[in-house]
């Protein structure tokens, strides 16, 4: 089977079963799961709060998951996505609440004449 690379983005603060479900669901769309973990500065700017766990701890916890093939910190500059060039995804999976990220990704890709399909996962009922 050919490798299909999937990329997701997130903060993953206080890694919990909902994060596990999202990541496992994303992995079912491909054979290789890459995870871009948000930097502390981005969490402060976008969510107007300080994350419980620092970026290196969040990165370590995500990296330790058996179904995650690689994890790395997001670009230092908000709104840039050089991680796409490094991860080389065939598909980007976003959560139900990542509308702003989707818009930013589409603008960035359009400016570079790059097209990577984006799929949104639905909100899960609790």
Residue positions per predicted region:
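Nucleotidyltransferase catalytic core that binds NTPs
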Residues: 1-126
């Amino acid at each position: 089977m050919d490798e299909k690379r999937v990329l997701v983005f997130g903060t993953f603060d206080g890694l919990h079963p909902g994060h596990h479900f999202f990541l496992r669901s994303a992995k079912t769309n491909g054979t290789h799961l890459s995870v871009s973990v948000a930097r502390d500065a981005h969490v402060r700017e976008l969510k107007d709060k300080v994350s419980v766990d620092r970026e290196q701890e969040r990165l370590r916890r995500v990296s330790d998951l058996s179904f995650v093939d690689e994890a790395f910190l997001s670009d230092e500059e908000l709104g840039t996505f050089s991680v796409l060039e490094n991860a080389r995804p065939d598909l980007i999976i976003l959560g139900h609440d990542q509308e702003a990220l989707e818009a930013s990704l589409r603008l960035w890709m359009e400016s570079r004449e790059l097209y990577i399909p984006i799929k949104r996962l639905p909100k899960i009922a609790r």
